């Protein structure tokens, strides 16, 4: 009986790790040569141009939380997120993975600047074939 209970617990642990997979933030950086935030600007509530964060992710981003000026822009595997100057983080929600919090200071960007384009690359976990 004890053996069955331990096997059941191990099965639940493995099952939960399969369904609660985490995405990885590969990089977040200022894209010096990308002028999309200037050529396709969006204004915040104070009538100032926003910063543009391009989220590169192969999959569906269902929602973005934080100081976001909506609507989001979908460009293939890239989601364009406009954020006011001074924003410090954003939270990405996807269909099949745990939410991802991107804190810009962790990648050397204290806060976003107006009219600048940033790129964040998000990757899925490697699937284990057993």
Show which residues each predicted segment covers.
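Bacterial N-terminal signal peptides
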Residues: 7-16
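Short loop/turn and low-complexity linker motifs enriched in small/turn-promoting residues
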Residues: 21-130
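Positively charged n-region of N-terminal signal peptides that target proteins for export
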Residues: 1-4
